[in-house]
Amino acid sequence: VMAGELGGVAEPGLILTPPQNGTLLDDGYLSASEVAQLKLNADWVLLSACNTAAADGTPGAEGLSGLAKGFFYAGARSLLVSNWYVVSDAAVRITTQMLQAYTDKPNAGKAEALRQAMGKLRADPNYAHPLFWAPFVVVGEGGASRW
């Protein structure tokens, strides 16, 4: 969710399945500031939901200053994020194909794995329009391995 997108939500975050008996600390909403407090040792975090590269809601804020910044601050080294609305089935296909490409050739890098997945989606006439594949980008350590 982008900052200000829902009433009462001042910062970007992820809407999770709420617990049966929610509390103030466990309400089903993981805000960017809550993410930043996590201690992660994550090589790659996939944020394939809508607008995960959006700004933090501050007027004039840069992209990636919201949820993405929180994950980097928490310890993620790479992120897959989206720059706008995503179509759910296309997001599933692109992330699945991207992870397969990365598993097959990890030394090629995360960005290359995404490029290959985008190419496969573009080759399908039902998903050739950029609406389906263009929202996604790898940020952080996405390049090829040097060794």
Regions inferred by a protein language model and the residue ranges of each:
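Catalytic cores of enzymes
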Residues: 1-147
